[in-house]
UniProtKB/Swiss-Prot annotation:
The active site is at residues 50, 61. The lineage of its organism: Bacteria, Pseudomonadati, Pseudomonadota, Alphaproteobacteria, Hyphomicrobiales. It comes from the Bacteria. Keywords: Amino-acid biosynthesis, Aromatic amino acid biosynthesis, Lyase, Tryptophan biosynthesis. Pathway: Amino-acid biosynthesis; L-tryptophan biosynthesis; L-tryptophan from chorismate: step 5/5. InterPro entries: Aldolase_TIM (IPR013785), RibuloseP-bd_barrel (IPR011060), Trp_synthase_alpha_AS (IPR018204), Trp_synthase_suA (IPR002028). It comes from Allorhizobium ampelinum (strain ATCC BAA-846 / DSM 112012 / S4). It is an enzyme of class 4 (lyase). The alpha subunit is responsible for the aldol cleavage of indoleglycerol phosphate to indole and glyceraldehyde 3-phosphate. This is Tryptophan synthase alpha chain.
Length: 279
């Protein structure tokens, strides 16, 4: 639903701080643990949840997220189960926006119309499908928009002034600015360059700009959040899950709590981001 996403960003604008957008892989390391992580994220400080859809060939993802996807698939995670996870979450939380993130192939195999109907029923607010360019909007973007599901696009440092309006044309919810070229989990970008890029995109759209790739600590979140409307953290969370597991990739008593601790720290950075910008 577009209203839930719009309300969240409007409320945060009133508070004078950026959003903390947290990504985790659905089903990693197993369904129950992953669901427990998802349920714990809002209380830990997450404002928007990105729910990863595991896929066997995740070309844009770094090793950490690739391995998380493999763990999830090995544990039996499917697109049906990922939707079920969102549905279970919604029983206790009607306020936190959920964005499903992944690749087109599993959705295509599932059936686009059925997927969108089921996503709406499960309480999904938006989609990020990294391998569907604007030229393919008829495939999924426009049908999603007709159902009031946001379709969130990625912009990069190489998205030039000519390309940017096309990227933004049917985008809703927010714009995800990938602050560095390459795969997920790369080094932290230069905050001043990020601020310049955010300003450049804002000249073309009123949508919130969320910045990701490379944010791992509260200080990173504070620096990026000084100019962005949202700070996206994914690889750091996925790495924390991996570090908490046994040698055979099973959850431990510390798995959920270790993610909560990390996210609380990141949230503290986001909450002081505007103070940093004002100094």
């Amino acid at each position: 639903m577009t209203q839930r996403m719009d309300k969240r960003f409007a409320d945060l604008k009133e508070e004078g701080r950026p959003a903390l957008v947290t990504y985790f892989m659905g089903g990693d390391p197993d369904f129950e643990t992953s669901l427990a992580i998802m349920k714990a994220l809002p209380q830990a400080g997450a404002d928007v949840i990105e729910l990863g859809m595991p896929f066997s060939d995740p070309m844009a993802d770094g090793p950490a997220i690739q391995m998380a996807g493999q763990r999830a698939l090995k544990a039996g995670q499917t697109l049906v189960k990922t939707l079920d996870m969102a549905r279970e979450f919604r029983k206790g939380d009607q306020a936190t926006p959920i964005v499903m993130m992944g690749y087109y192939n599993p959705i295509y195999v599932y059936g686009v119309e059925k997927f969108l109907d089921d996503a709406l029923d499960a309480g999904i607010d938006g989609l990020i499908v990294v391998d569907l360019p604007p030229e393919m909007d008829d495939e999924l973007c426009l049908p999603a928009r007709k159902r009031d599901i946001n379709f969130i696009r990625l912009a990069t440092p190489t998205t030039d002034e000519k390309r940017l309006p096309m990227v933004l044309q049917n985008t809703s919810g927010f714009v995800y600015y990938v602050s560095m070229n390459g795969i997920t989990g790369s080094a932290l970008p230069d905050p001043s360059k990020v601020a310049g890029a955010v300003g450049r995109i804002k000249a073309h759209t009123d949508l919130p700009i969320c910045v990701g790739f490379g944010v791992k600590t509260a200080e990173h979140a504070r620096l990026i959040g000084a100019s962005a409307d949202g700070v996206v953290v994914g690889t750091a969370i996925v790495n924390q899950v991996a570090l908490s597991l046994t040698k055979d990739d099973k959850a431990t008593a510390d798995t959920v709590q270790s993610v909560v601790t990390l996210v609380r720290g990141l949230a503290s950075g986001v909450q002081t981001a505007r103070l940093a910008a004002a100094q």
